[in-house]
């Protein structure tokens, strides 16, 4: 039985990835930062084929633990970087775990025989740290795809900057190591929407959907989104997981980084759809998904279907 290691495999996106690999007959090893916190991963135990699931404690800043985690894996998915918007200390909360964690991970996989494929869950921020606003030099209606120049700004949110630098680190590693025995590919989802598999309320993605659904602004950043009726390119969490699974099992994608996106809607229309009401405007296509459709044979769900089905679990 082939084994996949999924760093961040119990999170919002990671849970769906774990399900995809279990459903397809893989042994799955999922990381947990604190294995005593069973509430973080207990929802995975109800999945089909959960007898092939293993949970292993891991801190990505611990090189020894990382080397041990990847040591018996055929495929490794790295989605274990923090997604925090209300950040107090960007260096310790975002930059260190994201960038140092990526550097440590690259060192671990380079020194581990037997790995066949590595997939990084990057972010639209790996392409444009201004998201959901346009990249520098582009208008609100200009499209963006993998042929466009990557854009970053020191004024962007620390989360976006950290993801951009981490992706640059991966690209440099690929360039500096032309004779790797395994392939490395990345996916860069836009705003990820959908239902959480767990009953936890600590996911930033589901939390943002809850805020938009109820038009709550806990800080100036969120309030500005409402005030400017900002538009978001959106993708369903199930589609992100499917794209990651397909990327992991498909040969010949070394060095590719796929934008994962469906349609773009204004935040006011997102609010309507999250409340099962029809949007006022038709969707736009800003972040293009042609490459993922071509290479991965992906079809992306309409955003309306995804937002209409959103459920936020409250105790």
What are these regions (language model features)?
Residues 4-26:
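N-terminal Rossmann NAD(P)H-binding glycine-rich loop of SDR-like oxidoreductase domains
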Residues 35-100:
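NAD(P)H-binding glycine-rich loop region in Rossmannoid oxidoreductase-like domains
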Residues 179-182, 194-210, 246-257:
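Glycine/proline-rich active-site loop of Rossmann-fold NAD(P)-dependent oxidoreductases
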Residues 152-184:
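Active-site Tyr-X1-5-Lys
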Residues 290-293, 301-315:
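Amphipathic terminal alpha-helices
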